[in-house]
Amino acid sequence: MLSVTDRIKTVSQPQNGYVPKMLFSFERYEDCKELKPVKSALASIQGLAVDYLSRFILSGDKMKSFNISLLGAAKVDEVYESDEATKNVLSLLEHVTGLNRESAINVCKIVCYDTAYRAGLKYYQSPDETSFEDNLFDNVLILTERTLILLKDIGTIINDGLTFEGGYTKLVSSGDIDYLTVDTLIDLKVSKDDFSTKWSLQ
């Protein structure tokens, strides 16, 4: 049983992909703000932080926006027979209020718990063990602002984090979309890459 993204990793596509770049239209958004380099180890934290902070600002629902982080904290607590991880996430969430530096710092700490849920405790590294950088927090604010502008231009978000219950198969058992408007499914990518045929097939 695979997720959509795991299944795509096993698919051999033709040179330009099954859903080639030529089928897409591209728009450039320019805010004259330059992203700063961050260590590769922080790239996934940056992407998740932008995703979750954007969801929270749009919905106002902290528990839903940071659900995976909370599930990860619960996994940590289960293994260590404690409730400290969950308490820490909830404490950090109290200081997530919007598009500001304090929120960015706390969100980056919160998403560290995702790994415990997504990949297991073997790969989990607590916020206290993670070496954060100022560049990371700056980038999260810039990228979140860009995301909000993009989504506003696309149209009103009517739902987010949707799954496809009843639409999975014996081969693909999970997959979701980030945002839904009245006429568009949106899968948000926070990446320095230009285009990927894996993204388009997804």
Regions picked out by a protein language model, each given a short descriptive name:
Residues 178-194:
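Conserved catalytic cores of phosphodiester-cleaving nucleases, focusing on short active-site segments
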Residues 153-182:
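Active-site metal-binding core of divalent-cation-utilizing nuclease and nuclease-like domains
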